[in-house]
Structures are given as structure tokens and as C-alpha cells.
Amino acid sequence: MPKVRTKDLIEQFQLELVSGEEGIHRPIDTSDLSRPGIEMAGFFTYYPADRVQLLGKTELTFFDTLTNDQKQERMKALCTEETPCIIVTRNQDVPKELLQASRESGVPLLRSSQTTTRLSSRLTNYLEGKLAPTTAVHGVLVDVYGVGVLIIGQSGVGKSETALELVKRGHRLVADDSVEIRQEDEDTLVGSSPDLIEHLLEIRGLGIINVMTLFGAGAVRNYKRITLVINLEIWDQNKNYDRLGLDEEKMKIIDTELTKITLPVRPGRNLAVIIEVAAMNFRLKRMGVNAAQQFSERLMSAIELGNQE
């Protein structure tokens, strides 16, 4: 089922439906827009018919210079079975040739009072958000000191309990159990909760709790950009865990690589505090302060000094 249809644009941007009502359920499959200026001149070889078409003042002013036959020919070519809609901006008068072509082809003809540039920007942002690649990850997403921390790990390792402790310490829950993730651009992943389980947290032995009801509206968020992944796993004595923090592990979600930290779980370890420190340390690294690197440099300097003596 298409994520976006023409009728969604009409409702979202309060567009006036001039004609082509039978086509308002046409799907929109791309966030790219088209301003058919060169098509107005008669070049339709590479016409992107599957895009939303925007007709601004420039296009319609040039259109007025054409002959009557050219006007009819261009507008018929503009309205295809693939075209989701044509939007006339600035509340300009709709050419009668376009109105006729819209009625014959069933292409929705819409009108907006906004400028072409402004409407183009808003349409692009809206469509990119709706049509972005998505996936779902089993885990918990928490906003810790402004860092979107995705906590993953096998079932029963203590993800929800750790999230509860973080919420109790003043941080904000975004999603528990299932995190819906969409890629808004090349390096931006935004996580949110499915509507059915929004603001809910499942604690084994306690059941399902409503975080917003218990801790208030300040304890939850609807969505958050994900920048750090914490992987919880049962402590394995035969595995060598990172003790310096020099080697940075990565995890790929959709097309974006995120920093991943593996935390071994064993009795007595306060995971909530460790995750808080991991989030703060991550922010420091992004600001150029790397404690592990500084220690390594000091160690190498001490070794070199010792060798000289």
C-alpha cells in the first residue's frame, strides 16, 4: 500500500482541488519534485512524469507566449497516467488548456497560495519524511543527555529494566521492545515507537507500565535521532572485552553506520550509570576530547622517555 497519496498532500497543505477529483488516490512514490519549465518549451524526452509537478510564475508566464495549438499540446503531454498531481502556486489563474487536460486525463489539478520556493521546500521535507526507508529493531530507545541511545541485546538480558532506571534518573523513554527506525537522510536515523505501545514499558514480573502516567510528560519523547548503540550481553569469561576504548565498533542500520558499544552484563554492574557515562563520553568524543586516545599518547610518551634513559 502506498505511503503517500495525492489526497494526503491536499489535507496536509490545505490545497485547493480545481479538477481531477477522481485521481486524488494516485500514489506518490518519490520525494523529488518537478518544475516543468523545459517541458513548456516542448522537450518531453526526459519528462519525470511520476513526480509532483509544480507550476510557478516563471512556467506560466512562458506558457502565455505559446500559440493555442502549442498550449493544448504541452498540457496534454504534461498530464499522464503516472502524474500524481499538478500544483499551481501563488493562487495564479489556471490556464483553460491545463484545466481541460486535467479533466480528460483525471490528473488532480491543485492550487496553493504559497510561493513556489516555499511550497517546494515544505513538500520535499514532508515527502522525504514519509517515504524514507524504514526498519524495526528489537530494543529500547532512550534519550540520555541529548544522545539517542538504542539499547539492544538478547531477550531477557535486562534492556527494559535498564531503561526504567534511566527514566527514574531523569532521562526520557522513546520506545520499548520495538523501535521503528527511518532514515531521513544519508547519516540520520530517527527512532520512534509503534502507536500501539507508545510510552509503555514491559518489566518482567511487574507487567506493563505507562511511563508517562507514572513519571510525567517529561519522561517520554515521541521520536529521537539515534546516534549510539549499546549492546547488552551476558558476561562471557572467555571473551576479551574492550578496556581502553580505542577501538570503535560499528553497527549498520539501513544505510547508516552507528557507533556501537558492547557492555557485558553481570550481577553488581550498574548498567544505567555506565550508559549515562557512555553517552557523556560519546558527546565528548564528538567535541574532540578522547580520554582513551590521550591516555595512549601519554603512555607512549612515557615509554619513549623510559627508553631514552
Swiss-Prot record:
Write out the residues that bind ATP.
Answer: G153, Q154, S155, G156, V157, G158, K159, S160
Tell me which InterPro entries the record gives. Answer: HPr(Ser)_kin/Pase (IPR003755), Hpr_kin/Pase_C (IPR011104), Hpr_kin/Pase_Hpr_N (IPR011126), P-loop_NTPase (IPR027417), Ser_kin/Pase_Hpr-like_N_sf (IPR028979)
- Asked if the record carries the keyword Translocase, the reply is no
Superkingdom, taxonomy of origin: Bacteria
Report a single Gene Ontology molecular function: protein serine/threonine kinase activity
Annotated Gene3D superfamilies? HprK N-terminal domain-like (3.40.1390.20), P-loop containing nucleotide triphosphate hydrolases (3.40.50.300)
The reaction(s) annotated as catalysed by this protein in its Swiss-Prot or TrEMBL entry are: [HPr protein]-L-serine + ATP = [HPr protein]-O-phospho-L-serine + ADP + H(+); [HPr protein]-O-phospho-L-serine + phosphate + H(+) = [HPr protein]-L-serine + diphosphate
Free-text function comment from the UniProt entry: Catalyzes the ATP- as well as the pyrophosphate-dependent phosphorylation of a specific serine residue in HPr, a phosphocarrier protein of the phosphoenolpyruvate-dependent sugar phosphotransferase system (PTS). HprK/P also catalyzes the pyrophosphate-producing, inorganic phosphate-dependent dephosphorylation (phosphorolysis) of seryl-phosphorylated HPr (P-Ser-HPr).
Name the record gives this protein: HPr kinase/phosphorylase
The organism encoding this protein is: Bacillus cytotoxicus (strain DSM 22905 / CIP 110041 / 391-98 / NVH 391-98)
Show the taxonomic lineage: Bacteria, Bacillati, Bacillota, Bacilli, Bacillales
